[in-house]
C-alpha cells in the first residue's frame, strides 16, 4: 500500500531524513514516534507530497509520489491528512468545509456532497453542528471535523500528524475514539503521536525515529515489551514517566 525505499531529504546542507525504508500494508495501523525534530512529521508529509524529498522512492498503491507526472491533487484526495492545527476554513460552515473539496476535486454534485458530509458528521458525533463555524467549536470537535473532511474524499489511507497535541487533555479521548473506530474498520493509517496508550491499543506496528532515521520498526507487542533499540528504550522510559 505505502512503500518507502531509502527516502532522504535535505534542507540546504541539513539532512532531515536519512535512508528511511518501511512498508505499510493495506489495513495496517502504524504509529510513528520519536523526540522533537526527529523527522516524524516530515516523513509522513512526504507520503502525500506535502514535502519533497531528494533521494529514494515512495509509492502509494502503486503510484510514485515523486514522479513529475503524478497527479498530486488526485494523490492527496486518496491519502487523507489530518494536522495538529485542524486546518479548517474559518469563513465556511462545518458543512461547507466538508463539501468544498468533494465538489472541486471529485466533481460531486452539491446535494451528493452534502449527503456525504452529513453522513460523516453523524459518524463523528457532530450532526448538530453542521451549520456552525469552526471557531464556534471546541478543539476536539474541530479535529473530528477535520477527520470527517478527510474521509469525505473516500481515501485509501489516512495520515495523522500529532492530531491530539494541540488539544486540552479532556478533549484528547474524543479524537482518539474516532481514530480507533477507523482502525477497527480497516483504514490504513500512519499516525505521528506520543499517545502511547493509543499505540498499544490500536497500532500493529511502531516506528521510532531519531535524528532523521528510522531507528526502530517492529510489532507493537515487541516495542512495548523488551525487544527494542536502546535509543527507543530511552525515549519510551521518558514518555511513560509522565
Labelled PLM ranges:
Residues 221-242:
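C-terminal boundary and immediately downstream tail of ABC-type ATPase nucleotide-binding domains
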Residues 1-220:
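ABC family nucleotide-binding domain
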